[in-house]
Amino acid sequence: MAKSRYSRKNKGKKLQRAQQNTVSTEEKPEQEVETIDFNGFQIPKVYDGKFERKPMELEIKKGFVEGMNGDAKIFCNDDLLNLLTFEMIKDISNNYPSCVRQTANAATLPGVVGSLAMPDAHSGYGFSIGGVVAMRLDDPEAVICPGGVGFDINCGVRLIRTNLQREDIEQHKARLADELFKQIPSGVGTQAQIAFSPEDFDSIMKEGLEFLVENGYAWEEDLNHCEEHGKIANADPSLVSNSAKSRGYKQVGTLGSGNHYLEVQVVDEIMDVEAAKAMGITEIGQVCIMVHCGSRGLGHQVCQDYINLCMKSGICNPVDKQLTGVPFNSPIGQQYYSAMNCCANFAFANRGMITYRIRQAFETVLRMKPKKMDMHLVYDVCHNIAKVEEHDVDNKKVQCIVHRKGATRAFPPQHPDISEDYKEIGQPAIIGGSMGTCSYVLVGTQEGMKKSFGSTCHGAGRKMSRTKAMDNLTSKDVINRMKEMGIELRITDPKLAAEEADEAYKDVTEVVETCQAANISKIVLRLKPLIVIKG
């Protein structure tokens, strides 16, 4: 047996490589951890017999955590498994909540029929970020968990296509970056340029993107290319606290901060010509725009409000208090579900208002109408949400509440819940990379419905804490590297650029290729950035 001190003396070479690529949160005094070999990797000895390696999966066996209702799993190739083994060492030596443990913990919740994590997963609040957890609703104890959705409710991504080519905007790139940065407020606490009344804000929470269409800020056809057509039913604004409303009503059309961004991109490679054509993307060099943001202060406050309510109720006593929840059909469960839907509708409208500003900015700089530039929405997807869906459980159709936290719905061809335009190819899943790297568009598969509740990854996935990124990297170097790559970067606080550096994230290509190898989604095309707007 080997003994591991995770920062210096690991004997497993693969673990050492993971160690170089992954960075912990606050370090605590080290403890020696005895390790054993697992398929060529060093894992803590206490986990002996707790895992099974399958193609593109790490199966976490029932019993890894007491009270698990079944096995759990993480989709990963060998390189991504390296990172997980390092987290396991930290879990034991530092009491660090690893993604593996969090995925297993979620499998203990009442009513759960599946707990899994995507290749981009990393530890988060209670649930891993990249986690998918489904509970069967014919179990009266099945819970809904605010922490299983996260603080940025309906954080999501949308992609807008154009008929422009790279050469059409190359000479206007700097001015276009400036105009987008001016038109779209970004950064912590920023407010929108268009202020809505409290009454209108309630309408936005009920109607989502429909409100923008009715008031001339979005196109009718945008609705058909948005998950849930941009409006989730059962959204009652009276269940959203005044403090949450006060944080959100001036933020419709704002980007926010952290890993949220707007990118002007070009199509770099098309892997599935027919699927790309269905999306209106036909040429290498075609210009697209990607937007990644969510429900801003509104979603954060709603999540906190209902976490507090769930904890006070004492109904659910999970193995980790951050997993707190209540039965879905209980009064608090239904109140949270409705308030969450209000935030989701706000987020659809937020991305819709940003799109309105993008279209204006392109018109200002290029002196063409947005319709002439074919600035149509390809798709808008959520990746922090809980939804009622029908899935096969034990060979029966069962209604489930599916929590996706840092995971994208990716339904297969012919699924009734996707747009008619995409019935033949499957639901598009928009996957953003890290700052300065490529992004991808995927589509769902039939196998994904069986393996992952119709879910795939949502991005690259953080491997380095923000604090550690700032310690190890310099923002000046990150900004200079973007310039050398020919990328126009506009960022509200340049001192924080290192937080979002490429080195702080996993390789998005490796992530999406793992999803494809696991057959839970299929790669359609790749994009690379020309302009990056950050909060």
From Swiss-Prot:
Its EC number is 6.5.1.8. Mn(2+) 1 binds at residues 152, 155, 260. The keyword Transferase does not apply. GO terms for molecular function: GTP binding; metal ion binding; RNA ligase (GTP) activity. Binds 2 manganese ions per subunit. It catalyses: a 3'-end 3'-phospho-ribonucleotide-RNA + a 5'-end dephospho-ribonucleoside-RNA + GTP = a ribonucleotidyl-ribonucleotide-RNA + GMP + diphosphate; a 3'-end 2',3'-cyclophospho-ribonucleotide-RNA + a 5'-end dephospho-ribonucleoside-RNA + GTP + H2O = a ribonucleotidyl-ribonucleotide-RNA + GMP + diphosphate + H(+). Keywords: GTP-binding, Ligase, Manganese, Metal-binding, Nucleotide-binding, tRNA processing. Residues 1-31 are annotated as: Disordered. Transmembrane segments: none annotated. It holds the Pfam family RtcB. It is an enzyme of class 6 (ligase). Its cofactor is Mn(2+). GO terms for cellular component: nucleus; tRNA-splicing ligase complex. Mn(2+) 2 binds at residues 155, 292, 383. GMP binds at residues 259-263, 383-384, 432-435, 439, 458-461, 534. The active site is at 458 (gmp-histidine intermediate). Belongs to the RtcB family. Catalytic component of the tRNA-splicing ligase complex. PANTHER family: RNA-SPLICING LIGASE RTCB HOMOLOG (PTHR11118:SF1). Ligation probably proceeds through 3 nucleotidyl transfer steps, with 2',3'-cyclic phosphate termini being hydrolyzed to 3'-P termini in a step that precedes 3'-P activation with GMP. In the first nucleotidyl transfer step, RTCB reacts with GTP to form a covalent RTCB-histidine-GMP intermediate with release of PPi; in the second step, the GMP moiety is transferred to the RNA 3'-P; in the third step, the 5'-OH from the opposite RNA strand attacks the activated 3'-P to form a 3',5'-phosphodiester bond and release GMP. Catalytic subunit of the tRNA-splicing ligase complex that acts by directly joining spliced tRNA halves to mature-sized tRNAs by incorporating the precursor-derived splice junction phosphate into the mature tRNA as a canonical 3',5'-phosphodiester. May act as an RNA ligase with broad substrate specificity, and may function toward other RNAs. HAMAP family: RtcB_euk. This is RNA-splicing ligase RtcB homolog 2.
